[in-house]
Amino acid sequence: MMLSRLTEHAEGISKLMSGLKKSLLKGNNFLRLAWVRNFVYNVSMICIPIVGPTQSKSLQDIVAAEPLADILELRLDLMSDYDLDALLAASKKPCIVTNRTKREGGQFSGSEEERIVLLKQAMVAGAEYVDIETSTPKELLKPFLESERKSKVILSYHNFTDTPEEIEHLYELMCGMPADILKIVTYARDINNNLALFNLIHRSKKDGKKLIALCMGEKGEISRILSPLLGGFLTFGSLETGKETAPGQITGASLRDIYRVCDKRDAFKIFGVIGNPVYKSMGYLIHNRAFKEIGSTDIYVPFLVDNVENFFKGFSPYFE
């Protein structure tokens, strides 16, 4: 019965959108909606951060992460002790080596020169990827990016306060730097902030750039699910609850098993619930399980919305 009702809902959703909007604007802030534009799927990856804090725990977590991860991130700044060669050898998956500064949400307390030395050592050790921030002093960043290397460099920007209006300009500046992959992560103060990152992903595909674009915070959780489906290079998921490396990060198990972000899809539609709160709703479990059971490529996500009118103003171009 549930699957039949779900199918009927999907087929008739475009006719319901105008009625949904009127109902929501009257104050009913907890209704299902569908972002019903068809999207073409892009193959992406789930990255599981390994946070230690000890060498032995890191090795255990590498093994535990293997079934969930397409790629691992070794967060050296969060490890009290580590043997990088041993960690890289233990992983059957490609690894990103990150040594995050405190100003960008990490814990590395040494000098910038010391931090760069560790990243260079990671490249020599055979890390497939290394992450370096745009905030790195220019006299260190420029030669690092221009150096001969086998490792691919992820050039990253993090903003833990908001999603700045000049995000497009930032992207353009980063495109002018010799990095292999760009990473832009901002804080979502409103659900519509996610659209700025989705637009960057769309632009990066036209530009032929590999881009990781995500929003942090509760209102940014949808980006962690949808960005990889829209063409983002990868998304981050914690190994388990309590091992998040950024606000709003959800578990790798949820990304892979509930939202199926790595499943192959020819095209898909995005359904969801909007309201505040939305995370007490079990709709994402019920609907995504039902989609899987009926062989649908569609997805259902929670949209944490404070202002319904602004939400429809921002997202309406994506409705059919």
PLM region spans:
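N-terminal ligand-binding/catalytic initiation module
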Residues: 233-235, 252-320
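Polybasic, lysine-rich low-complexity intrinsically disordered segments
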Residues: 21-23, 28, 38
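Catalytic alpha/beta core domains of metabolic enzymes, predominantly
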Residues: 136-267
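Active-site beta->alpha loop and helix N-cap motifs at the rims of alpha/beta catalytic domains
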Residues: 46-59, 65, 69-148, 154, ...
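Methionine residue identity
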Residues: 1-2, 17
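Short, positively charged and aromatic/hydrophobic N-terminal segments
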Residues: 32-33, 38-41
